[in-house]
From Swiss-Prot:
One of its GO terms (cellular component) is extracellular region. It comes from the Eukaryota. GO terms for biological process: neuropeptide signaling pathway. Detected in the thoracic perisympathetic organs in larvae, and the dorsal ganglionic sheath in adults (at protein level). It is found in: Secreted. Keywords: Amidation, Neuropeptide, Secreted. Belongs to the FARP (FMRFamide related peptide) family. The modification Phenylalanine amide is found at residue 11. It comes from Lucilia cuprina (Green bottle fly). This is FMRFamide-19. Its main location: secreted.
Length: 11
């Protein structure tokens, strides 16, 4: 989304 890093971290 806004931050690709956060998108991977939620998984």
């Amino acid at each position: 989304s806004a931050n690709a890093k956060n998108d991977f971290m939620r998984f």
